[in-house]
């Protein structure tokens, strides 16, 4: 088992005006999220979110972080969200085991001492996408089946953005310290997500793109200020960090899905500032 946690530092809008393609990818793109038998995480200084992939195969896996966070155990001062995008598996949370099929989610509150991830079949392993944010209070652990996610249809075929937003961890459904997490699926024939674009100065956000309709599908993710945009080309199962001051949207060569996760000082989902289309550059 390999464990690796990369670090991404925070940048101002002025910084990325001077980034070339290589530098932009180094600072905002996570190219490898899932690797069989491994835990691959990224710590971003944007609101101190930790995110990444856990892929257990023959053996179960546990995230063990202490000195790196200045604590005795990983979730001593953090909460955790999980969504499985792979084969069937399970999570054991302080001794309580829950089955996790594809698209199932789980919220795990501050103070939980042990979270163990396992796959039912090593040949078809679970792929647990995990997101952790700082916490100040303990909220109950809760399994979040896909069937119970709050579905919100958005967009239309004319604008190539027909999609469904599935809210797993959302202030309208459950209490958390600051974590919000969900899953957006674009319909065949649609390619744009989050367009028209917006920003939310009180929350940062990560996007993890996956379930590409074709092997050669690519997504061009847009970030930066609305008048100074940049793009990053993403492959399947890659993630990008979006600072709170940045737009965050993308267009694919075919349809796809992505997991979004947010944290910051405001949990109101609709607390955002729309960007007029004529402002984009």
From Swiss-Prot:
<dbReference type="InterPro" id="IPR027449">
    <property type="entry name" value="KduI_N"/>
</dbReference>
<dbReference type="Pfam" id="PF04962">
    <property type="entry name" value="KduI"/>
</dbReference>
<keyword id="KW-0862">Zinc</keyword>
<dbReference type="GO" id="GO:0008270">
    <property type="term" value="F:zinc ion binding"/>
</dbReference>
<dbReference type="GO" id="GO:0045490">
    <property type="term" value="P:pectin catabolic process"/>
</dbReference>
<feature type="binding site">
    <location>
        <position position="205"/>
    </location>
    <ligand>
        <name>Zn(2+)</name>
    </ligand>
</feature>
<dbReference type="GO" id="GO:0042840">
    <property type="term" value="P:D-glucuronate catabolic process"/>
</dbReference>
<keyword id="KW-0479">Metal-binding</keyword>
<feature type="binding site">
    <location>
        <position position="248"/>
    </location>
    <ligand>
        <name>Zn(2+)</name>
    </ligand>
</feature>
<dbReference type="InterPro" id="IPR021120">
    <property type="entry name" value="KduI/IolB_isomerase"/>
</dbReference>
<feature type="binding site">
    <location>
        <position position="198"/>
    </location>
    <ligand>
        <name>Zn(2+)</name>
    </ligand>
</feature>
<dbReference type="InterPro" id="IPR007045">
    <property type="entry name" value="KduI"/>
</dbReference>
<dbReference type="InterPro" id="IPR011051">
    <property type="entry name" value="RmlC_Cupin_sf"/>
</dbReference>
<comment type="pathway">
    <text>Glycan metabolism; pectin degradation; 2-dehydro-3-deoxy-D-gluconate from pectin: step 4/5.</text>
</comment>
<feature type="binding site">
    <location>
        <position position="200"/>
    </location>
    <ligand>
        <name>Zn(2+)</name>
    </ligand>
</feature>
<keyword id="KW-0413">Isomerase</keyword>
<dbReference type="GO" id="GO:0019698">
    <property type="term" value="P:D-galacturonate catabolic process"/>
</dbReference>
<comment type="similarity">
    <text>Belongs to the KduI family.</text>
</comment>
<protein>
    <recommendedName>
        <fullName>4-deoxy-L-threo-5-hexosulose-uronate ketol-isomerase</fullName>
        <ecNumber>5.3.1.17</ecNumber>
    </recommendedName>
</protein>
<comment type="function">
    <text>Catalyzes the isomerization of 5-dehydro-4-deoxy-D-glucuronate to 3-deoxy-D-glycero-2,5-hexodiulosonate.</text>
</comment>
<dbReference type="GO" id="GO:0008697">
    <property type="term" value="F:4-deoxy-L-threo-5-hexosulose-uronate ketol-isomerase activity"/>
</dbReference>
<dbReference type="InterPro" id="IPR014710">
    <property type="entry name" value="RmlC-like_jellyroll"/>
</dbReference>
